[in-house]
Amino acid sequence: MEIVKTIIPHNRSYIEPPIPSATEWLANMSVMHVSCLTIACVFVAITFLSSFFHLFFVLKYVSNERIRNDMYALIFMFPITTFASLVGMFIPRAAIFLYAVSLVYFMFTLFIMVTLLFNIFGGRQEMSAYLLQRNIRVNFTVPPLCFFKFLPTVESTDQNLRRIEWLVFQTPIIRTLLELVSVVVSMEQEGRRESVWFVFSQLMALLSMCIAFYGCYVMVPLGREKHAPYRFDFLFRTCDIAQCIYTIQKFVFEFAAAVGLITSDRYLPAAAKALWWASFMCTWEMMLLSALCSYCLRPAKCKFFDLYPGNDMPALSARDGSNSRVPSFSRRLSIEYEPRIAGVMLEPPSRSSLSITPRDKIEDPTTVSYFADNFDSLSQIQGQ
């Protein structure tokens, strides 16, 4: 709201009435407000029921423990945000703080999405090996920098992937620190938000969020053929849309309050009224997204649920791309990734590493000729 007031000209001499306490608000609500609160309670209850339904299937049908832990955080994204919005509708004075809590959790889920992507491959190092083996490079020409064609591509090394990961991980840390300082400044001003600090903190939070989104947009396209059976793209887009709705919607309502489309009344001042309606919109929007996830990520069509009896999602073999039954994460073979040095296989692709003895590797003429063919390329790489 502070950024909107700074940009939009308004009457600075006008002092908005104070936000009522929860007792005053509940005692003087209109019939429309009571009806909306009742409907919001129903939406939140449905969201919680859906989340417990999701939790049951994750606990029972996801074999990998690290993926289960990531899924827990994503499952509770919708109930936490809707519950915070509902409490803010009951307690208008706490709505701003609860909105900040939900936004911090949204930023935390961005980092969880990156961690989940790593765990699909088995870890960050395994993902790096997979990408290097297929010569898949990191492309930085993604939104919002999709028109900057001059941006270089870099190798998908473990160090580069870690740097992109930190682009995402910085935002929950920065937002948490900014909100803690904002609470201290607000208490010092007896609840008023008239300090220039709030404009600065919101600008910093916006910049941090944009950097985190950019890091996700760079990371998600990597290895898409590998994580496509998991419907990871849909899962990420759902989280992305939820955060955009939660952030942009509040700005739109605050803009309407700043230009006079939403005015103060005997119930709430304009700023609190705008946030109240934004919170109400959030309850049914998150419920719809939760229902959409229930259908599109159903266990029979999503490779995450590898223990589900009806899961028949085909898995691509790492060597020949043939279809097979989805194996459990705990039963993956050690030959899923081909051993390579500087992008060159350590053995001919026609023979399995499990069937070659050390003596075969020395005497096999196929192996000798294979390394002879690739000797020049290895020398060039080392020379660089």
From Swiss-Prot:
A Pfam family assignment: Solute_trans_a
Record field: transmembrane: 39-59, 71-91, 94-114, 166-186, 203-223, 241-261, 274-294
Which keywords are on file for this protein? Cell membrane, Glycoprotein, Membrane, Transmembrane, Transmembrane helix, Transport
Residues listed as glycosylation sites in the UniProt record: N11, N28
Q: Which residues lie on this side of the membrane: Cytoplasmic?
A: 60-70, 115-165, 224-240, 295-384
SMART domains in the record: Solute_trans_a
Positions on the Extracellular side per record topology: 1-38, 92-93, 187-202, 262-273
MF terms from GO for this chain are: transmembrane transporter activity
GO annotations of cellular component type: membrane; periciliary membrane compartment
List locations, semicolon-separated.
Cell membrane
What is its membrane topology? Multi-pass membrane protein
Chief localization: membrane
InterPro entries in the record, alphabetically? Ostalpha/TMEM184C
Function, please? Answer: Probable transporter.
Family to which this protein belongs? Belongs to the OST-alpha family.
Q: What is this protein called?
A: Organic solute transporter alpha-like protein 1
Record lineage: Eukaryota, Metazoa, Ecdysozoa, Nematoda, Chromadorea
